[in-house]
Amino acid sequence: MSQLWDRPLRMMRWDYMDDFSRIKHENLESLAKMKKEKLHINCEWIVGTPGAAPGLGYLTTFQAEGFERYPGFEDFDSLRSYVPYAHQYGIKLLVYLNMHWFSYDFAKAHPDWEQITSGGDPYGKIHPLYGNGTTFCVNSPWRDWAFRLIEETMKTGVDGVFLDGPVIYPDCCYCSHCQEKFKDRYSREIPKEDWQDPLWKEFIEFREDSMAHFLHDAQNAVVGINPEGVIFLNAGSWQPGGWRVAREAKRLARYQNFSLAEAFFHPFPGRHNLYASAMTTKYLRATGKPAVTAFHYCMGPWHYTFLTPQEMKLSVFQAVGCGGNIWIGGATYRHEFNPGGCSPLHETLGFLEANDDVFTDLRPIADTAILFSSQTSRYYISNLPELYRDLGSGREQDLIVDLGTGRTIIDWSKRKQICENLTTSAYEGYFTALARNHVMFDIILDEDLSLEKLSGYEVLILPDFACLSDKQWEEIESFVREGGSLVASFESGLYDERGNPRFTEQRLGLLGIKEIEGAFPPARGENYIIAQEDLWGFKKNNLIERPPYALQLREIENTATPFLFMNPLERVYMPLQGVSDYPAVIINNFGRGRVVYFAFPIGTFYGSERIPTHEQLIKYVIGYLGTPRIEVCAPPSVEVEAYRQESTGRIIIQLINNTGDMQRPLTCINPVSNIEISMENDSIKSGYLISDKAPLCISRQGEKLTFNIEVLRDFEVVVLESK
């Protein structure tokens, strides 16, 4: 039997923020028809319990036994009234259920449901949700109330539910129900935050297990009414820090049909991540469940105005190009002020609908895998005191250089935040460098570190910081021994899965390290790496900017050290002090494979500073370690993703043009000309672009084929047919 996710999904929530009951005055058949034919969606969310002030998530827009109706819906059942029309036009109907925001009055009626902080106060008392309201605990009797609501929702004939929450908030939960459950498991009281206490780490696991257990039982409530029913929630994205709200996408994926996370565009000071939608989608895809990337098309917190057309399209095309589905927050109120503001989205979704078969049943073609580790996000706190020193920004203005105070941060919570910020930059840095250089790569997760999974790749990247178990390290070692290649940097793999130091001979040896003597004095600026030979696009004696943090280590025998650190300088505008004998890069042949190790956090440095020499190092190292199946000659702002269509054998190559006007939000996308793509594949007989269906002119030399794309505007798909 076909499933909801067998075809690409174009989800939308059509909202009435000022008055939810306006839906009962609509012509429901015309509304469903408009959404299908004009908006081109095939899956809609409809509000079952609103997320509205002052926390009215306990009120329903439909008849539900034992539940109070939302004002305006006393004589109107929104779900039972609308579902026949949605299904008539081929739209699957999912119900939005608010599970995190409740009024103080409702909480007073259920005094043992609220989440309690370590200080003994309800979370909502200290941190009112959206300025007014509180939240409930997944281990309290509220869970049974929630499951009854889900069952009542599914009885209406809808196709599934989306749960907006629950959320286990920071410093929660210390309620009596959590205390009892924790004590049953660990025979101890719940500790307060203390990163040196192993029991605190158990509490982090307990919170995530509690969230997963709630979702498991919620799924049972859905399928108990409709075995084909769908359930999912906001699973959290790739950014470190998800432990604060007990969100770990892979753990939750076991009990939901989709993995969804938000990639909303918000204007803010500073640099925006150009690949926000792409990173979110690839991360969610790694959970093993269909990815859904969510965005609204309003101008950030200005909900009554539209995002620029270019940003709308960029979000959609990055998500689709990376193999994901899309969710869009739609609303009547924006259209009333600007009826044409949504036209770019209509055009884009119409294009996707017209070419639906091209985006179906795709398996990524990837030579490289990069680890995004939730273990690291949870537990990594470096043992290096140098990471916690205030170095300032290094900026020079008005004859003053900002060199910071030089003081070392002692507070462990602040240290944890620093390490999360560094890890965020590492992920963004490696991802950006790979995408800009058209490397075909997957994100993989901790659970994927097995020889069976890794054997599908030529190169594995451990970005700067990685907390790994002995078993995971042994699998990586086997991967390299049997011919795989490893890129590792800084403290990758030097901590176990709970963040405890693991500077063992086995781990250091794989990286080519004999011993770590310490770290260079941290400094922002005026410290360098020097090339010892012509390699990776550098000439001998070329200088490369050294990041603030770098390790002083000794290499084992029979390794190559083509780049060395220069001796450190105390401040800027000083003469160079010669070359140290500490390697900056180690190349270690191990079994039939090879390891390239950077003794500095290259991903973090490129992610934060965008200095081109470090992008060059990453680019050339990947080429040095493996031969790409697909080669692309295009500007770095063109993102390329490749797939094999399982049902047809076709090769599908998607190109996303991120070439904008050097500011965000983007207001124009500049067309790119003369893109060349080559690959080794003698099974391809022909090809075309879906923009015009005109046949490609393919040249062949042996098994290698090459073709050109004359002009790329915002998005293009190449379809290569098999013989």
What are these regions (language model features)?
Residues 650-657:
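Short, well-ordered beta-strand segments enriched in hydrophobic/aromatic residues
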Residues 18-38, 61-91, 144-145, 210-214, ...:
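Aromatic- and glycine-enriched glycan-recognition loops and surfaces
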Residues 466-542, 568, 602, 608, ...:
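A glycine-rich, often tryptophan-bearing local segment used as a flexible ligand/cofactor-contacting loop or short
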